[in-house]
Regions:
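Patatin-like phospholipase
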Residues: 1-69, 77-263
Length: 263
């Protein structure tokens, strides 16, 4: 085929949002049956991970276990729903959304990143980044989304069994990604949650994969190997903002190991 033919073919198969007639999940051609796929968080560094997710989907790869924390949970749900369009737009498109945050949002106590808008009001049909819930819910994979429970100091993981509809998924993704100070605490079933990277693994759901019996893991990182987050320099900020949860949060901030370890 000529270059023009190839360009026409690319245009005709370009990913489109869920809800349009042309939308289709990326097909599965290869199953990696004994490997868990783990996505590290890292805020907008997840944009680079999203490019890898696109490559995995375009290659037709399927993993029986997919899990992530913080921005990693966004890549997790897009991988499981096999949505090439949303994989990119959930990060790149977000930068053009005027309601996504800023200092005005922070002053109004919605957070510097307006997590309520980002996670609860952009994913329904007809909204900015419609999510393919039917494909996600029907996926033959184990899914794990991790968040830090502030009142107990434990990392909590949710799976497909905990979510019956889209409205169950969205607050869990919000909780997993809510950075202290920059975003409000999220309450689920009456319990307070923040960014899952506050947990003991520092943002890697490798403990959840191991608990589910996986020994081999493909861990997609957003920091260099060996990176360690320094101890929190201003614990007083957290003391003022989270007095009832101080010990759990400060202990986590000062001891989290942000490396998945040898795998």
């Amino acid at each position: 085929p000529t270059p023009a033919d190839r360009l026409a073919a690319m245009s005709s198969t370009r990913p489109v949002p869920y809800g349009l007639p042309e939308h289709a999940p990326a097909p599965i051609t290869t199953r990696v049956d004994d490997v868990a796929l783990v996505f590290e968080g890292g805020g907008m560094r997840g944009t680079y991970t999203a490019a890898l997710v696109q490559v995995l989907l375009e290659a037709g790869l399927f993993f029986p276990w997919v899990g992530g924390i913080s921005a990693g949970c966004t890549n997790t749900v897009n991988m499981v729903s096999r949505d090439l369009w949303r994989t990119r737009e959930a990060f790149v498109g977000l930068t053009t959304d005027p309601q996504a945050g800023g200092w005005g949002s922070f002053i109004r106590r919605r957070g510097y990143f307006n997590s309520d808008h980002i996670y609860r009001h952009t994913s329904a049909p007809g909204e900015l980044f419609p999510f393919d819930w039917p494909t996600f819910k029907a996926a033959p994979a184990t899914v794990r989304i991790g968040s830090f429970r502030c009142d107990t100091g434990e990392e909590v993981y949710w799976g497909l069994e905990d979510m019956d509809e889209l409205e169950d998924l969205l607050p869990r993704c919000q909780a997993s990604s809510s950075m202290p100070v920059l975003m409000p605490v999220v309450h689920i079933d009456g319990a307070p949650y923040l960014d899952g990277a506050l947990g003991s693994t520092g943002g890697f759901a490798t403990d959840a994969a191991a608990a589910d019996g996986y020994e081999k893991m493909l861990v997609v990182m957003t920091r260099p190997v060996g990176y360690r987050k320094p101890a929190e320099k201003r614990p007083g900020v957290y003391r003022r903002l989270f007095p009832s949860n101080l010990l759990n949060i400060l202990s986590s901030l000062n001891t989290s190991d942000t490396s998945p370890g040898p795998r």
